[in-house]
Amino acid sequence: MGNNQGKTLKIGSYHLNFVKQIAEGGFSYVFLVKDSNTSKHYALKRILIRDEDELKGVKHEISIMKRLTKHKNIVKILDYHKVSDKNNTEMFILMEYCSGGHLVEIMQKRLSSGSKFTDQEILKIFQDICESVAYMHSQQPLIIHRDLKVENVLLDEESGIYKLCDFGSATEEITRMKNKTEMQNAEDDISRHTTLQYRAPEIVDFYRSPVINEKIDIWALGCLLYKLLFYVTPFEDSGSLGILNSNYTIPPNHTHSNDLISLIKIMLNPDPINRPNIFEITNQLNLLRNQQPLFPSHKSNILLSYNENNNINNNNNNINNNNNNNIVNGKNIPKPLPKVVSQTTPTPTPPPPAPSQSPSPSPSPTVVNNIENNSNGLEHSNSNGNISQPSPTPPKRRATPGTTPSLQPVSFPPNNSNNSFDDPFRDSPRTNLSNNPFNVNSNDNSNSSNNNNNNNNNNNNNNNNNGNNITNEEILNIITQLTNNDQTNTFDSGLLLKLKSMKPGKGTMHIIVKRPLKEPLVCFKSLLLVHALLSEGNNIQFKSDVHDSKDLFNNLYLGWSKQKDRYLQLGELLSHYSLLLYKFILFHQKNYMIDGSFAFEEMKWGIPESLDSNNHPISINTIKALFDIMDHLFLVQNNLSDYCINNICSSNSSGSGNVPISLLQHCVNILNSSSYSIFCFISGSIDVLSKQFSDVDMKLISCVNQFQSMYTRLREQYTKLAQVPCFSDIFFPTLPNTAPTFTIVRSNSFNRLNSSLSDLNLNNNNNNNNNSNNSNNSNNSNSGNLSGNASLNSSFDNINSSNPFSTEPTFNPFSATTTNTSESGFGNFGLSEPTSNPSPRYQQSNNNNNNNNNNNGTPISLTPGSLSPVIGAKKPPLPPNIHHLQQQQHPQQQQQQQQQQQQQQQQQQQQQQQQQQQHPQQQGLRFPHSASLEDARLYTLILTPSSSPPLSPSTGPTTAAQQQQQQQQSQHTFDNFNINGHAPPVPQSTQPSFQPHVSFAPNVNINNNNNSHVSAPHSLNSSSSSISSISNPNLGGIAQKGSGNSLMPPPLYKPAARGHRRSQSSNGDEVRRRNLLQQQLEQNRDFLNHNRLLNKQSRMNNPNNLFDEGDSGFGDGEEEDEGLLN
C-alpha cells in the first residue's frame, strides 16, 4: 500500500495527506497521515469490507470506540468515512496518533538492549492498562475487550501514557450457553476474536462454565502481566493443556517483586468466580504505587487477604514436614507464594505480611484452585525432573461442591502424564494401573494410608477426603449401575449425563476393568460407556486413563473372537466393537489435539505446512487413519444389523445374547454420531488441503477417491440400518445428496499428473467392473459403482466447496455411455471431445436386473441409450487429458464409431447431392444461421418426415446425439445445419424434393408446472420443447442442457454449479417424470398443428409451389403426425 504516499483524503473537516504506512493486518492497513490545516499527525485505519457481516462488525467497533473515546488510556476516535463502489467497500477510521508505537515493539527494543522493564515501570504500564479496562467494565452495559495483549497497547510519547487500542473483538454481551448449539456458536465466536495464549480456561473448554463474562479479561491481564515480567506468555509451550490445568512456570532466580508474582497468581485462577474483578486489581495497583484507590467501594488490598490465607495454611501444616524429599516422594506439592529472598525489589508501600518460608506447608481445604500448587511446584520442577505434579482439569462445580480433587495428598503413578507441562499423550509407554488409580482418594481410606510418604499429611486433609470420597462413591455407583447384568435396567441416559458432568479421569478404567466383562451384556454396556465418554469433548484425563488400559480392548477382541461359535452374531459384534474402540484409543493417543467429538477446529490448529505433516491434525496421515476407523465402523454396523435381523426381529425377543433392544438402539446412535463426525472432519480436511496446496499430489487424489467411496458406503449403511425394524424410530444423520467435491488446481508437473491419473482411471474402471459383477454375491460391496468416475471427476471440479454440503452431484447420473465423435449430421458443430460418465442408475439396474414397463406393458431394459435424460443437470467438460485417457481405453469401440461416422457422412453427402440436382433454386432455403437452437429444433420437428422421438436417448449410433449435445454446449450459430441430424437417414423415396422457407408463428406460452427447472437461453417456448413417446425408441435423445422440456440429448458434461438431485431416485420417479413429459407433449399438440396449418396455407397461396402432398413432410395423412404427437 505504499502507493498511497502523497495522496489526499477528506474526512469531515480533516484534509489528510498520506505520509506512510505504519501497520498492516489481514484486511486492514494503518497509515500515518497529516492534516494540511493544522499540520497535526493522525493514524488512519483503512479496512477492506467484503460482506455485510464485516460491515456490521466495523460499525460495532466504531460504536464501541465512540463510547470509550473520553478516557485518557484509550485511543480516541476522531472521525470515520465509508467509501463504496461497484467492486469494493472500504471504511476509513481516523484516530489519534501515538508516536511511541506498540508496547511489544518497545519490549523488543528493551530486550535487545539488555535493559528490561523495572518493577516500577511495569506497575505504571499495567496500571494504565487496568484503568482502561476498568472504564470498559464500568459501562452500562459493560464492554468486554476479549483481546487484551501487549500488541494492542500503544504509547503516547508526549504524555507518557499507555493507551489501549483495537476494539474489533469487544462485545457487550455476556454469553450464557444452554445447549450444544449455543456452545458451538460461542466457540466459533471466541476462536475469531481471541488469541489462544491469552484465553481463559472457560473459553478453551466450554463445558467448564455455562457463562462467559468479563472475567476472561482478568485472565488475559494475568497473562499480559506475566509477559511484561518475563517477555513470554505463561502458556507459550504448554498451550491449551497448560491453560486448562493452569500449569505455568515461574522462572527461578527472577528479580521481580513478590507482589507482582502474587498478583499474577491471583488473576490466573482457573475458577472465574475466584478471580478478582478489575476494580480490585486497579485499587491494588494504586496502593503499590502509593496512590489513593480509584474505586473506594471495592477492595483495596487483595494481596493482603491472599497472603493471610496462605499464612493460615502454613500455620496449619505439621512443622515436622521440613524435608522436601518426603514431600516429593508423597507427591504432595506445597502451595505457598514463591520464595522471595534478597532479590526481591521493595515496593513503595509497606509490604504485606510475608509468607512463611517453611518448605513444607500443606494446602488449605478452603482454597478451591490449584494455582499455588502450580507456582511452587513449577519452581521445583525446573531443578528436579523427578517431581510429578498433578494438575488435572478441575471438575464442574455442580459435580464437586467441595474442594478440588487436585489438592489431595494421594499417590500418583510415577509416569503420570499430567505431571509434565507437555501434552499428556506425548510419552507413549505407559505403566499398569496403580492400586489407587484416582487422582483423588478412593472410597477405601486404607488405600491412601498405604502411601507411606503421605502419612504425615493424612490428618490435615480429612475434610477434603470426605468430600472427595463422596464424589468417588458416586462415580463408582453410576458406573456399576450403567454396566450391570440386569436386562431390565438398560443404559440410563440421565446417569450417563451425570457421569459426563463429573469429568471422570484417572481411575475410571480401574472400575470398569473390575466388572465381569465375560458376561456379554456387561461387556456390551462397558464398551458403550467407554465409547460415550471417549466421544465427549476433550477429556484429557480420561483419554490418558483409557490409553493405559488399551490392552484390555485388544484382549476383549481376541477373547470374543474365540466365542463366536458359542454366541454367534453377538460374539462377532462384541469382538469387532472392542477392536473399534482400540483403534479409537490409538488414534486419540497420536492425534491428541483432536477431541473425541472430532470437531474440526481449523482456526485453532492453523494451516498445515505439508500434506503429510505428522504433528498437525489436518494431514493425509490423519485422513488415512480415519478411513481405517470408518472401515471397521462399517463392519460393526453390519454386525448390529445382522444380529438384530437374525435374533431379535425374527423371534421378537431379546436375542440369544440377551441384549435389550434399547441398548442396541443406543449403540446405533453412538455409531451414527461418530461416523457422521468423522465424515465431516475428513471433508473439511480435504477441503483445506486442496485449497492450501496447489501442487496436485496423488496422495490427495487417492484420499478424494476413498472419501467418495466412504460416502457411498456410509449412505448405504444408514439406509440399511434404518430398514431394520428395531431401528426404524432412530434418527439418522442427514447426508448430502451426493458426495462433496473439492477444487484441486493442477500445477506445472502436468506429465507426472497425467501418468498418475491414467493409472488411477484404469483402476477405477476395473473397480467398477468388479463391483458390478460381484454386487449380487456380497452384501458388503458398498464401495459401489458410484465411486469410480465420479470421484475422479470431482477431483478436478471447478466448484468451490468450503462447506461439505454446498454442492450437488459432480457427475450426470443419467448420461450416455462413452463415445468419441468428430463429425456427424450436424456438421462441424460443438466440441470435439465429449466426456463420458456411466449412469449409476443404469449400473444399479443391471446389477439388480430391474425392468421398467412402458405404457403398452412391454418391458423396457434400462440400457444406456434408453435411460431417461437428466432434467436441469449442467455438466462442464472434463479436462482434456481425461478425455484422452478415456479414448485410449476402448480402441475397438473407437474403430466402430469411426466406421459409423464415415457411413453417416457418405449418406449425408448423397442426400445433399440429390437435393441440389432436383431443386437447385431452393438451395438457399436452409435454416438461417442466426436462428437459436430452439428454433432449429422446432424447424426439424415440423419439416422432417421422421418417426416420433422417444422418451429416452437412442439405442442406435450415438454420434448424432453427441454432436447435438456439442451444439447446445457451444451455443454457436448454425453451420451446414442438417435437419435430419436427429434421426436415421430417410430412404430416398420418402425424402422431400426440397426444403422450403418457413415463417414461424409468434411464441406460444403454455403453462408449465415444472417450475423447478431453468429454461435454456434463446428458447422459443420452454413448455413446448419436449415431445415424448415410447412407441419408437430408435431416435436420438431429447433432453437439452438447462431445460427439462427440450428435444436435445442428455448432457454429457459435468455441472458447473449445482448438479442433479436424482442420483438416488427410484423407478417411481422415472415413471412420474415420463408422465410429466407426456402431459407437456399433449400441450404442444396445438402448437404443432398451428405450424402445420401455416405451412399448408403458404403452399396453397403460393402459385409456384413445387410441393405435392405426397412429397411434403406433413401432408394430409395423419399417421406420421399421430406418431409424432402421441
From Swiss-Prot:
One of its GO terms (cellular component) is cytoplasm. GO terms for molecular function: ATP binding; phospholipid binding; protein serine kinase activity; protein serine/threonine kinase activity. This is Probable serine/threonine-protein kinase DDB_G0280111. Residues 367-390, 796-825, 833-845, 857-866, 1095-1105 have a biased composition (Polar residues). The keyword ATP-binding applies. Residues 314-469, 760-901, 944-1072, 1095-1126 are annotated as: Disordered. Belongs to the protein kinase superfamily. Ser/Thr protein kinase family. Residues 314-333, 413-422, 432-469, 760-795, 846-856, 886-901, 953-971, 1003-1035 have a biased composition (Low complexity). Keywords: ATP-binding, Kinase, Nucleotide-binding, Serine/threonine-protein kinase, Transferase. SUPFAM superfamilies: Protein kinase-like (PK-like) (SSF56112). ATP binds at I22, A23, E24, G25, G26, F27, S28, Y29, V30, K45. It catalyses: L-seryl-[protein] + ATP = O-phospho-L-seryl-[protein] + ADP + H(+); L-threonyl-[protein] + ATP = O-phospho-L-threonyl-[protein] + ADP + H(+). The keyword ATP-binding applies. Residues 16-295 form the Protein kinase domain. It comes from Dictyostelium discoideum (Social amoeba). Its EC number is 2.7.11.1.
